[in-house]
A protein has these predicted regions:
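N-terminal Rossmann-like NAD(P) cofactor-binding subdomain of oxidoreductases
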Residues: 1-98, 201
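C-terminal substrate-binding/catalytic lobe of Rossmann-fold NAD(P)-dependent oxidoreductases
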Residues: 69-72, 77-201
Length: 201
């Protein structure tokens, strides 16, 4: 969806339109819960809620940067396959996306890292990422590697996320887990993202 299409709702009388995904249109603010939702009152009439990956990362990156300072970071998201991919090998602009999504791990780009920097502009130039599309129907996992301004332990990192997850502000946005869960266990989970504490290094 672009600004032009979404603006038709404004012309029809809507006070605000939320694009429930990313947009490349100029003049559309990106608002993500847990990252920059405090700016919603002054945002453009048409706003973007970004992608599922961006929503899962927004609070995580905001907390990492606020608590420890992020110098540089890299994202690898292992993402369930999407409607943009082919179910059998076929020609596409991105040849990898044209390969059978149900039988391949498909490396591709992700706009999530750039979208996170739209919500957390202090991370611009410090955050990049790639995506691996895998043959699962739902749920994705994101692995973030970060160089921080402070030397920290695994316990300190996890405690920052545990503390944040208990704050009223992050309810329904950020969860934590110390259980040995897999993707299927997260189906129906209402958080934007859950930090798997057992995987912190």
């Amino acid at each position: 969806t672009d600004k032009e299409g979404a603006s038709k709702h404004i012309e029809a009388g809507a006070k605000r339109v939320v694009i429930s995904g990313p947009t490349k249109s100029d003049g559309v603010d990106t608002i993500v819960l847990g990252a920059n939702d405090d700016k919603i009152e002054g945002a453009t009439e048409v706003i973007s809620n970004a992608s599922c990956t961006t929503n899962s990362l927004g609070a995580v990156m905001a907390i990492l940067d606020a608590e420890f300072g992020v110098q540089k970071s890299m994202l690898t998201t292992v993402h369930s396959y999407t409607a943009s991919q082919a179910i059998q090998d076929a020609p596409k602009k991105d040849p990898r996306e044209g390969r059978n999504a149900a039988e391949n791990i498909v490396p591709t780009s992700t706009g999530a890292a750039i979208a996170v920097t739209k919500t957390l502009p202090q991370l611009e130039g410090k955050f990049d990422g790639i995506s691996m599309r895998v043959p699962t129907p739902v749920v994705s996992i994101s692995d973030v590697t970060a160089v921080l301004n402070k030397n920290v332990t695994v316990e300190e990192l996890n405690n920052a996320f545990i503390k944040a997850s208990k704050e009223p502000y992050y309810q329904g946005i950020l969860g934590v887990s110390d259980e040995p869960l897999v993707s299927r266990d997260y189906i129906g989970n209402s958080n934007s993202g859950t930090v798997d504490l057992e995987l912190t290094r």
